[in-house]
Amino acid sequence: MAAEKIRVGIIGASMRNGWARDAHIPALSALPEFKITAVSTSRQETADETAKHFGIPHAFADPYKMIQHPDIDLVSICVRVPFHHQLGMATLNAGKHLYCEWPLAATTEQAQQMRDLAARKGARHMVDYKPAEPAGSIASGTWSPRATLARCFRAR
């Protein structure tokens, strides 16, 4: 019996520009184990535009409402760094898995808070930095919230 698809909500998924449009949505859409179920942007009209273009069922102007939606297992954060910590903490507090663009947070302390909360909640989290291969870990199939082992390939 096949495993259920991992349902993804993407924060910062504007059709007008950005990594979500150019990398995350195409990569996730190409993989059979993922299904994008929601997008969020700062304005409802751009969220609706993205959802319609890609055939995504839910669109939100409020990322926190999207995070709480029951049809989401994994949240992908594709917004500016100052918002990573707050959105990441909300995601983890909701019991969702987290995939975030680099850097995970603005400070080491914020990143440690997110790491600790993920451990307490039993959630998987990952930050991806592959400018030459956007959404590289998702596209290559090397990451899944169902995985039991994470490995750091590079650190500074």
Task: Label every PLM stretch briefly.
Residues 38, 58, 74, 124, ...:
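Short, Asp-centered acidic motifs that coordinate Mg2+ and/or phosphate
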Residues 10, 60, 100, 125-127, ...:
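Hydrophobic residues in well-ordered beta-strands that form the structural core
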